[in-house]
Amino acid sequence: MAKGKFERTKPHVNVGTIGHVDHGKTTLTAAIATVLSKKFGGEAKGYDQIDNAPEEKARGITINTSHVEYETESRHYAHVDCPGHADYVKNMITGAAQMDGAILVCSAADGPMPQTREHILLSRQVGVPYIIVFLNKADMVDDAELLELVEMEVRELLSKYEFPGDDLPIVKGSAKLALEGDTGPLGEQAILALANALDTYIPTPERAVDGAFLLPVEDVFSISGRGTVVTGRIERGIIKVGEEIEIVGIRDTQKTTCTGVEMFRKLLDQGQAGDNVGVLLRGTKREDVERGQVLAKPGSIKPHKHFTGEIYVLSKDEGGRHTPFFNNYRPQFYFRTTDVTGSIELPKDKEMVMPGDNVSITVMLINPIAMEEGLRFAIREGGRTVGAGVVAKIIE
């Protein structure tokens, strides 16, 4: 049978499976791909294809991740699944696979376990906006009351980490039954119910081009007779000639006006997300702008230097530190295009952080950076990456 051609018209959403080891994340991933390919077309993937996750590098860190695609009536999904707990930690902190929503897989037979809790906390810290729960292995629990108890436990745990535990969808089923072709309520029907929850509960993400204009400054030139040109790749939004913009970060915020946009030496009336452009600024001196700042829509982003974050510290094998670090450790924080020195405050109960650990920290930078919750950064020592992190909450 001929495969239908891939329709780019469907909105695209990124999701992933999270949860405790052996609760069935990979089996569920295979079941979703298999059941949906039967119903809506697309490629079915077996458990072995998914479990054998290829290595990839994100910010110099090796992560094993499997990528699976599937579609529903209304959407196209890209789904990530990681084999090991450490891969999840790295994946979520580096943002290698940004998730618009996550499917928390929890065994109905075991209930929430340590990694269930840790993945929920990580989701909160790195800004995963929506979680849907799949109570797996429901065929192994005969007692309806027990099933209800596990559901209550999971809801309470989610609420504890500020997710709407009472309101988010929970689907009960068996990924194994579904994968084996069982068409009953715990088999394929549960997978279709989960797909419906994905479609209805996770909103379509805003496209980059619809966001507020933001361009991280990579280089600054002065062109005689024309003024100052700032180059970089537009991260989100659109910039039109004649619009006011702000230069944010490192020093006091300045206002200026875009008098031209160039791409491949051609003049344009606008640039949009994804474009590598030169932006001509009116009345701005070359020394007023530097790498590490951003050009942004006025009022859309502010400079900050005090924040909490979640970091993963590279292990020795990954080229990281060989020794632990302690409170008040002062590395460089690499945001977008530049390094800023900052000091790290550890949680009260943490005396030191070992290579290979992940930990919540509070950071004080020496210079402010245009910052939002969810912004990724690298931690460096003398140009060498020793960790990766994400801004969890801005303090000031």
Swiss-Prot record:
Chain sites annotated for binding GTP: 19-26, 81-85, 136-139
Span list, region G1: 19-26
Keywords from the UniProt entry: Cytoplasm, Elongation factor, GTP-binding, Hydrolase, Magnesium, Metal-binding, Nucleotide-binding, Protein biosynthesis
Stretches for region G3: 81-84
InterPro entries given in the database record: EF-Tu_GTP-bd, EF-Tu_GTPase, EFTu-like_2, EFTU_2, G_TR_CS, P-loop_NTPase, Small_GTP-bd, T_Tr_GTP-bd_dom
Enzyme class: hydrolase
Subcellular location: Cytoplasm
Region (G5): 174-176
Annotated CDD domains: EF_Tu, EFTU_II, EFTU_III
Region (G4): 136-139
Chain positions covered by the region annotation G2: 60-64
Gene Ontology terms: cellular component: cytosol
Sample GO molecular function, one term: GTP binding
Protein residues bound to Mg(2+): T26
Coiled coil: none
HAMAP family attached to this UniProt entry: EF_Tu_B
Oligomeric form and interacting partners: Monomer.
Similarity comment: family membership: Belongs to the TRAFAC class translation factor GTPase superfamily. Classic translation factor GTPase family. EF-Tu/EF-1A subfamily.
PANTHER family, per database record: ELONGATION FACTOR TU, MITOCHONDRIAL, ELONGATION FACTOR TU-RELATED
Function: GTP hydrolase that promotes the GTP-dependent binding of aminoacyl-tRNA to the A-site of ribosomes during protein biosynthesis.
Name of this protein: Elongation factor Tu
Gene name of the record: tuf1
